[in-house]
Amino acid sequence: MVLKKIKAGISVKIMLLFKHTVELKKHLKQNSNKVVGFVSTMGALHAGHISLISSAKKECDIVVSSIFVNPTQFNDINDLINYPRTFEKDFAMLEDAGCDILFAPEVQEMYSEEELLLKKQNIEDRSWTLGKEIHFGSLEKVMEGAFRPGHFNGVAQVVSKLFNAVQPDKAFLGEKDFQQLAIIRSMTKQMAFAIEIIGCPIVREKNGLAMSS
């Protein structure tokens, strides 16, 4: 059954919200015959993120998005503290875009205390995802990675956890963050996830500046 509500005189589908992996997996298992698309975000959404939702809707039966401000990819604790959190606005944007499911876990749902401690002790190109050690070599040490040591390890770690929770058929990422896209492709291959990684075209501001997604 598809739940709908009336918004501005128009009937729109209600987006489901899950905060726990077990409940999300249980729901998705009931729709195992459907093609699931996934768009991961840290919130503070804009048109670039919504374009990924639109791309996913064109190719998938169910579109899942996530909002999770990932602590393991920040080099500076102040950046983590000051990262914009606009959940209500983000929720409305995703629902209006036709996203079917939002996964918005707390930190405790995604990481154990031991994992957070291990991240603090992380050395150069070593990354632990779902108990498996993976390596990105020089891929994470150039461009943005040269100035943010450990950043892409944190990205790969959280995306692997999100992939494990959602178990999508396809994941949609913006080509603007090209290095991150390459890292996710590498992680997906090393972890043997049966997920198609789809890079989506860059969305730009009116002045030509690329939107980050």
Task: Locate the predicted segments by residue.
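N-terminal amphipathic/basic-hydrophobic helices that include classical n-h-c signal peptides
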Residues: 1-14
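Nucleotidyltransferase catalytic core that binds NTPs
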Residues: 12-213
